[in-house]
Structure formats: C-alpha cells, structure tokens
C-alpha cells in the first residue's frame, strides 16, 4: 500500500483504518501493543510523474569501462511492481587498483547524489559489515533513486508514481505503544529493532 499510495490518500487512509480497527480490538482485550516500521518512504518521481533515477552502472561504465565495476542494489527483488527495483541506496564493487576515494568524489558530483563513501567510511557511518559491501557506498537525495542502467529496469509494471526508500532521508519511522514507556536513557537513539527491548523492559 505505502509503495503505491501516499499518506493521506483515500486508499492509504482506508488501509490504516482497517489496521486501527484490529488494533482497537486487541487493545480492548488488554494486549500490550507496539508498532513500528522497517523503513520510511518518500516519493521518488519528477514533475511528470516518471521515476527520477541516477543510473550508477551507466556512470561507472562510462568512467571505468563497460562492466569494469558492478553496482548492487539491495532493494532488488523479484516483485518489482511497487518499486521497479529502484531505491536510494547502492553499493558498487570496483576493479582492482581503482581509486575508491576519487570515484566516490566523482559520484558525489552527480545531481541527486547525497553522499558517496568508501567501504570503511560507509560501513562505519551506517553500521554495516565491511565484507558484505562493495568498495563504495552511495545514497541519493530525498526524491531520487539509484538504478543500474536503463535496460536493466522494467518500468512497465509501475502503474503509480514511484515511491521507494533506502536513503538517509527514509530512516525516520514511527514507534507507537499503547502503554507508557519508562526508563529509557535520555541519550538513547531508538531504532526499530529496539521495540522488543522496550516492550519487555521499559513499559509500565
């Protein structure tokens, strides 16, 4: 729903009304409820309603030679109806001897790219495992997504303007409980997986 229908739209409102009715029944029975999300979401399309894409594989092919580097999009999955395999995060593997810092700087000069990091920089910033990421890590700005190259994305299945996630701008999410939360350290940065600890250890 959220991929295709923005907050406040009739379909989204009907969806949340349905969920709320079920939660109300659980609350009435005395259940302790906690809700959170895996990620946020933003519109990622231009003024014409078309996906607003930075094709990173194309850029690296032009810079380093065709297929010398390989861009990986973690959002890629077989079900592309919602997001067209476009997200605001990418990692890229570079050929041996390539200057990752220079290439990251070059990528940052592309309109729509918020930041590009070397492996060590990006993994430290986003708490990622170094051995699972490429030589560079890239995030786009709020309303842009990162793709590989145009011929590798099937846009025919996108029936609504693209909404997707993966960037720093998409990190903010709600966490709702039906009981007061107590005893959390004031400087604690809450993340979605903290919901289990909060429910078990910090509710009255």
Predicted regions and their residues:
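Feature captures the catalytic ectodomains and active-site-proximal regions of enzymes
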Residues: 1-204
């Amino acid at each position: 729903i959220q991929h295709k229908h923005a907050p406040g739209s009739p379909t989204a409102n009907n969806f949340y009304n349905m969920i709320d009715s079920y939660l109300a029944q659980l609350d009435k029975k005395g259940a302790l409820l906690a809700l959170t999300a895996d990620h946020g979401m933003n519109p990622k399309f231009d003024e014409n309603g078309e996906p607003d894409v930075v094709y990173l594989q194309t850029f690296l092919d032009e810079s380093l030679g065709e297929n010398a580097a390989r861009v990986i999009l973690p959002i890629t999955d077989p079900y592309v109806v919602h997001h067209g395999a476009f997200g605001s995060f990418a990692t890229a593997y570079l050929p041996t001897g390539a200057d990752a810092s220079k290439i990251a700087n070059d990528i940052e000069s592309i309109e729509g790219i918020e930041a590009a990091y070397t492996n060590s920089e990006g993994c430290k910033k986003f708490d990622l495992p170094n051995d699972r990421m490429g030589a560079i890590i890239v995030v786009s700005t709020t309303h842009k997504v990162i793709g590989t190259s145009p011929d590798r994305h099937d846009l025919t299945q996108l029936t609504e303007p693209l909404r997707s996630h993966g960037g720093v701008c998409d990190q903010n999410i709600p966490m709702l409980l039906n009981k007061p939360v107590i005893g959390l350290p004031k400087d604690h940065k809450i993340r979605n997986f903290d919901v289990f600890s909060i429910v078990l250890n910090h509710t009255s």
